[in-house]
Every structure is written in structure tokens, then in C-alpha cells.
Amino acid sequence: MMRTAVPPVACVGEPRLTAGFAEFGRLDLAAHEEVHGPIGPMEPAQLLRLAEGMQLKGKGGAGFPFARKLRAVLESCERQDLAAVVVVNATEGEPASWKDKVLLTRAPHLILDGAALAAYALDADEIVIGVADGMVGRDSLMEALEERRMPVPTTIVSVPHRFISGEGGALVNGINGLPHIPPGTKKRSSDSGVSGLPTLLSNAETYAQLAVAARLGPYEYAALGTDDEPGTVLLTVTGAAARPAVVECTAGMPLRDVLDLCEVPDVQGILMGGYHGKWITPEAAEKAEVSRKGLAAVGGTLGAGIIVPLGVDTCPLGEAAQVVRYLAGESAGQCGPCKMGLPDLARAVDLAVAGSQPADVVRAAAGEVKGRGACSHPDGTARFALSAIEVFAEDLRLHSTGDGCGRRVRGVMGLPGAPDVNPQKLTLDWSRCDGHGLCAHVVPDFIRLDANGYPAFPPTPVPTWLREGALKAVKVCPELALRLAKAE
């Protein structure tokens, strides 16, 4: 799916957030009111009872109870005698996620309804909606705001489109005109957020779910879903899916039903929860239910509802290595363990994939960054890398021989930017090689000497960060036996 296109949408079961999509495509205000009906304001106690009764948890990945956030802001406003600000986090910095873009482009009024409910209950001064610059959905959101009257002034703020854009503290910093990175120390936005005021900050889908429940009431809302996770879930299914889509399904539904809907073929593993998520095996996927509890039971995580299955023709560790390199580059660069440790972790994963280092090097590098940053970025990256080497242990064994797994890296993880358009691999003219061994000294991370003193290296493409060293090794070969060739 291109990042400039409106994603396809599918539904398993009763549509709620996606109701009316089939009939109207995008719901303008008239269509929105026809499909969802009217909605009235709520006093603080009413909104708290609703949020608690529906057991609403944040849909941005962390799953923090919305009622606790709301109560914290109410108490902070009273304690400090300050007005509140409501912030909608629609930045969706995770490249593999599309659910917020769907809501922005197809159902913007649901998001605005939820934000308006919160603003009225808090007697807020303003609503701020954070979106990524150049993001799909901004125009739709602006059109929706022009169609209606909000209870308080409402503005849209664009922030840099980066992975860490969705971190709450980074968004507040960006809105306040500061560098759009997480604060160096933990801060509670409920005490001091936008303009130093108590701030209610939650994800776009969270506000949309609140708007749905306000019309249904907590009991009817809970008619779908599980006892501890009522309602529906928005998922983004990509990867090997023949029909990639954003899917709305009932919480607790078998994962297999969602995979079948998106025509997912046989897989080696499935990434659950996105780039800060975890991989699960095909066997685990057959038993999994789509809920936080259900996925945790099989070793996965729901996160922001991202599902990336990998087909059997794809090198899973090569795909994972690309993601870890991307995440290392997305560091805010303000915390030493993250700034220095994540590139080390990416290097360790690359070396393990190349067969140059054992998996213990990855585990050690991950251990150096876990719990050592101002935000959860290093922890999430470490979790992703460790999960990959655990679930794809057999592939790792094949890579450890230096011969690789025999499958290609296809770039199916949804990473932004163009893939490597000129992948290159090393080749050797055995009739020329005299075993001088200079090449192994130039780029020891990729070339080693076998028992007879001749060079040995993986048949896989040379990692981009080793490309310069490989080229130097080619140049110093006295017999002109070593060459760089296009990798097919």
C-alpha cells in the first residue's frame, strides 16, 4: 500500500467504526449523522462512567485506561485551578499502521465527536489534533472541521513524520514549539502538557471508540467483544496478505478469521503489534484471539493492531534486520544508550544474519539498551529483535553456516522510503584466488578465512553499512579474484 493512497477497508462481523463505509465511502457530516445518529454533551461524571463501563483503553499501542487519564486531568485542573487541553494523537508514526489514516479519511467526524465529548466534560480551552506532515487525512479532517461547530477552538498541528512522532511527550513538545522528540525525563501530560496546562492526550481511534460508545451506552457497546475488552478492534494487515487492508473485527475473534479474510497464505511467522511488537509462529497464530489478553497468551502483543505475516518465500531475518536498522536511525539521539546502543543492536542483527556472529551478540546488544532511555523506543526495538531470533531460530541456524536460508529479502515490512535499488553481493573467481587473505582483514565482519586460508562469505547481499568495506576488499585483492556483482 502506498502511503499516499486511501487504504482498503474490510470488516469481520458488525461494523461500528467502519459503519457506512460501503454506502458512502467517506462520511461527511450529513452521512455521519445518518449512520451514527445524534450525540449530546456529557458532564464529567457521565463521561467517566462511560469510559469505565466500556473499559476503554488507549488504541495507540500502550493500552492505558482512558478513564484514568480523564480522572487525572480533572483532578489536576481542580488542584492547579487551570483549564485543560484535549489532544488527539493522529500522527501514526508507525509506518506499518494505517488505521488512523482510515479514520481520518473516511470517518473524521467520529474522531471529532470523541474529542468534543472530552473537551465539554473537561471545560477545556482548546482541542489540538496532531498529524504528521504530508500525512494522508489532513485535508479530510479540515473539511470535517469546516462542516461543524466544535465546543472549543480546534486546531490541526503538523509534526515531522517520524517513528517517534507518535510518542505522547514528543507530540506535546512539538505542539509547544519545541523539538519534536520525547522529553529527557518522564513527564505527566495530565499535570503539565500543552502550554503547561493539564492535557488529555489519546489516540485518534480511542476518541472514535468513545464516540461510538456514547451513542450505544456501555452495555450495548459491550455486546461485542470479550469481558475484559469489549467492542471492536481496528487492525492493519499487510505483508504477505493477498488483500492487505485495515480490518475492523470483534475483540476476541480468532486471528485465523482475519488472516483468511485478507487471503494470507502459508507463513513462517507473523509480526504482531508493529515494529515494537513481537513475532509469533504459525502454530501460535492458529490458536490466537484478537485481543490483548488473547495475543499475550501465545507470545504476541496487540500494540496498535498491526499484523505483518511473512510468506514462506521471504527471508525473515533479513526483513527483521532492515527494520532494526530503520529503528536505529529513528532514535531521537538525546539518550546515549539509545543513540549508541541501537546502531550496535542493528549491527549485531546484521552480523547474525550474515553468519559472522552468534545470536548471543544480539542478546547482549539488546540487554545494553533495555530500560535505558527517556521513552520506550530502545525497549521496543530490543523486544522486536529478540523476538525475531527466537521465533526464527531455525533460519538463524541456517544463516550461522554463512550460506543463508536461501530466501530473498523482499522488503515487505512496510518501511518508508525506497528499498535498496542496487543490492550487491560478493563473488569470487576461484581460478584466480591464491588465498592471500587480505580481504578478510579489510572487512572481517563479512569475510572470514576457511580452514585452508581461503575467503568465505555469505551469498546474501552485502549490508549497506558494509558496502564501502567490501568495495575496498575488492580493490586490495592482488589477484583481482574478488568482485562485487548485482544481487538478484
Positions of PLM-derived features:
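Ferredoxin-type iron-sulfur electron-transfer modules in oxidoreductases and energy-metabolism complexes
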Residues: 37-50, 82-84, 90, 100-104, ...
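Hydrophobic alpha-helical positions that pack around
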Residues: 82, 133-251, 262-264
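Iron-sulfur cluster-binding cysteine motifs and their immediate structural context
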Residues: 337-343, 379-380, 434, 438-454, ...
